Curated annotation (Swiss-Prot):
Ranges annotated as biased composition (Polar residues): 474-483
Reaction it catalyzes: an alpha-D-Glc-(1->3)-alpha-D-Glc-(1->3)-alpha-D-Man-(1->2)-alpha-D-Man-(1->2)-alpha-D-Man-(1->3)-[alpha-D-Man-(1->2)-alpha-D-Man-(1->3)-[alpha-D-Man-(1->2)-alpha-D-Man-(1->6)]-alpha-D-Man-(1->6)]-beta-D-Man-(1->4)-beta-D-GlcNAc-(1->4)-alpha-D-GlcNAc-diphospho-di-trans,poly-cis-dolichol + a di-trans,poly-cis-dolichyl beta-D-glucosyl phosphate = a alpha-D-Glc-(1->2)-alpha-D-Glc-(1->3)-alpha-D-Glc-(1->3)-alpha-D-Man-(1->2)-alpha-D-Man-(1->2)-alpha-D-Man-(1->3)-[alpha-D-Man-(1->2)-alpha-D-Man-(1->3)-[alpha-D-Man-(1->2)-alpha-D-Man-(1->6)]-alpha-D-Man-(1->6)]-beta-D-Man-(1->4)-beta-D-GlcNAc-(1->4)-alpha-D-GlcNAc-diphospho-di-trans,poly-cis-dolichol + a di-trans,poly-cis-dolichyl phosphate + H(+)
Pathway: Protein modification; protein glycosylation
Protein name as annotated: Dol-P-Glc:Glc(2)Man(9)GlcNAc(2)-PP-Dol alpha-1,2-glucosyltransferase
Transcription keyword on record: no
Biological process terms in GO annotation: dolichol-linked oligosaccharide biosynthetic process; protein N-linked glycosylation
Top-level lineage group: Eukaryota
Naturally occurring in which organism (per UniProt): Aspergillus fumigatus (strain ATCC MYA-4609 / CBS 101355 / FGSC A1100 / Af293)
Subcellular location: Endoplasmic reticulum membrane
Amino acid sequence: MSAVRPVSGISLAARYAVPFVLLLIPLWMAKVNTVVPDPYLDEVFHVPQAQAYWDHRWFHWDPKITTPPGLYIWSYILCAAALVLRGSPKELNAGALRATNVAAAAVFLPWRLQTLLDALRKVRNTRPSGAWLSHTVLNICLFPPLFFFSGLYYTDIVSLLAVIEAYNWDIKRSAGSWSLLKTAVFVATGLTALVLRQTNIFWVAIFLGGLQVVRRLRQSSKASQASSLLQIIQSGFNNELYDPLVSEASFFDYVKTSISLVSVGLRNFIPIIISTVPYLVILAAFGGFVLWNDGVVLGHKEFHTAGLHLSQMLYIWPYFMFFSWPILIFPVINLVLPNSVIPAFFDYGFTKKQKGLPRIWTALVIIPIMLAVVHFNTIIHPFTLADNRHYIFYVFRILRSHPAIRYAAVPTAYFVGGWAVISAFGFSTTKPQPQFVPITKSNELAAAQKGQLKEAARKKEKSERKSKSKKASQVTASPPAQDQFSPEVLARIQEHLAQRQKQQQEVPRASFVLVWLAATALSLVTAPLVEPRYFIIPWVMWRLHLPPQPVPLVYRQQRPRDEREALHADLATNFSLFMETYWFLAINAATGYIFLYKGFEWPQEPGKVQRFMW
């Protein structure tokens, strides 16, 4: 039976509820404006700078601001449009500027995320499911660090929006007419993303450029059937690419894929360079800015010197696990537990290749590397330990409470968390393959009789009743002979159909994980500070490319017979999505309440309320 996602009233209700739930974003901003009307924390720098631009003082710049002026230009455009249409605002305060962030978070970002997610599904040749797409977009917009800063005047929302828009145009330019014009628009949106935040270079140039290289190589090469490392290198120079599905890839397969990409890339060097020209233009523009600015950050250079902070690539895994456990928990249970103990409601029917914990030798390679990073490269920025208003202050307080804790986190939070997060790209299933039955004499007779009926109907339209009756009786007398397939042939057909189905579904492959990891690492390891905001774009890209939650096996084998069964199937399939929604709402309610109503004072600043935040 088909493995299409079941549709019932509950999924459609979730889809239509999305705009109403997104109203929480302006409501959150309104509450912040009531309780915290004045600029808070980084807003103290951003709000006066935006006000200077509003007064057309374009050359005024606060030397403490580290990011480019894109946020202030965005606010200027929206506020100028509002002034023309409504006659206000004539002067900008924190509330008016926060509203420009809300416009991005509640209107433009959901729209462009929906467009991007739909495009990604179509590129993968899968049927878009409107309810699932809309619910996924909603959950991304409710992602707690993203939701929290949507009510404040920070750069994160508009920065993410620019990256998403660049991704949309990168997909558009690969298909259809006017590709040159679309490429120019993509380059413009990519440069716009850099005007909002410097680290966006790793997403609009490295990430999107890497995906373009992989697409080009896959289009111009054949799939490699090699297994050994030497064979993979040789097949690469024969234009055969080794790139297994994430669901079938081991740790060593990622090493093989890296080597295969290099060898196939060398064979297709000129076409790759041509296809990456737009990304190279963006990289060149960024390089020119760095040379002109004598560094990456604009202000406070003494506190934001670039370095190698490898521990960031350890912290990201518990970060993802904390926020995304609702969509990870049941697939992970399917991976580690035998099918016999999993309730049918949550049994996804994963294959043997998908199931199981990481292999021992994988742990023996990865865990010592992680321990070495913890020992030699744990960097704690002075700002982290000096500011108890951020939750990350208390995380590091726990890690520093005993020397053994930071090492104990390696096999549990870092290694297992990383395995679960990367495995999530392979949480996909395929529909059952048609079962072929060898044709026997009774089968031949049934097939012949079926053919007779079709033939008789066709003859009836073309000839007289008498001649038609004669021809039909002749066909009845001699049923057509049919060849019998051997079991070996049937097995090969089954295997071929299974491979074709996987190719059509096009779930993430090892090459995508490598590109995503590269962009994530480059954007994080160069940052000395550990801030939850820095992980937003890596999380969003991870969340966008996760395959849909698997349909339980019992509902793939048999279609729901009535509305009640359809409701049960829909609940089982979308249960994780709803859990994610409720989890995000709970976190947002808790952190919002703490921010607004659980303030405290510093002894050195009496009378001034300090507030907890991400």
